[in-house]
Amino acid sequence: MQRLQVHCRPLLAILLTVAMLATTTGHTSQEEAQTCAQALGQNRDIADGLLDDELQVLSWNIQKASNEGWAEDLSNFGGGIQLAFIQEASLQAPIAQTIPMPLYQAFAAGYTTDSQSTGVLTLSTSSPSLHCNLTAWEPWLGTPKATSITEYPLRGREERLLAINMHAVNFAMGLEDFEQQVHALGELLNEHTGPVIIAGDLNTWSASRQELVDSFMHRYDLIAVDFTPDLRTTAFGRALDHIYIRGMETRTAQVIQVSSSDHNPLLVRLQIL
């Protein structure tokens, strides 16, 4: 299987890409999410490879792959995964190549400088049939926070898997910008009828942020994956990283303690119902 460098060249014809970037003029991702929702299920070409009912899934804020040992850690626990949700991924780091299997890459750009491009990166053993990028903005810093939305055909099923990789707005005193970023996903969740995974660094460092996320997920019938022992990275005593699922059940779930990032990775095995 060939590795697709989606940040370097256009995707093949089998991959329908809808690139959507909000602007700093106060627009939210709502309109972009509506456009993406309308494209769900529209690409009928068979993708390269199909995902199975049982999936090994990783979610990790890799802190720009800037710390010693990240590649060794990722190689050690990345074997056998079908989906990886990476936040603060750097295009200058060989993240996909570090995982010991060929993976397709779907990148949504976040903070970018002349020397480094970072964002959220979704890796998969199957080529996505749809890829949309949504962008929110940090209200104080004016920097982007990305969400990558991918859709995957499933082996032996008509329905498809919707995978949402989010790095949530962080530096905001109120909830307005955070709420807009989260609620924009409702358009997609209303339209999509198959299984769903939402994973990422949701920056739920306050009770009000966590309550907002919990209420939103409950509204669209998503449930949180529980971790015991819960070794997830915290701020102000609250876990920042989450995995929510719909139309799936959790078989195993663990948090791996690392020193190669300021976030501990989440590794789960999920079964599509």
Q: Which residues does each PLM region occupy?
A:
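N-terminal, active-site-proximal structural segment of metallo-dependent hydrolase catalytic domains
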Residues: 2-100, 112-117, 183, 273
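Metal-dependent phosphoester-hydrolase catalytic domains
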Residues: 3, 26-45, 151, 187-196, ...
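Structured beta-strand-rich core segments of catalytic domains in phosphoester-bond hydrolases
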Residues: 29-43, 83, 87-160, 256-257
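Residues that flank catalytic or metal-binding motifs in active/ligand-binding sites
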Residues: 41, 53, 117-119, 146-148, ...
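Active-site beta-strand/loop signature of hydrolases that rely on acidic residues for catalysis
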Residues: 55-62, 72-96, 162-166, 185-212, ...
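Surface-exposed cleft-lining segments at the edges of enzyme active sites
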Residues: 132-140, 166-176
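Active-site-proximal loop/helix segment associated with metal-binding centers of metalloenzymes
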Residues: 156, 161-170
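Alpha-helical scaffold elements lining the catalytic groove of polysaccharide deacetylases
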Residues: 176-187
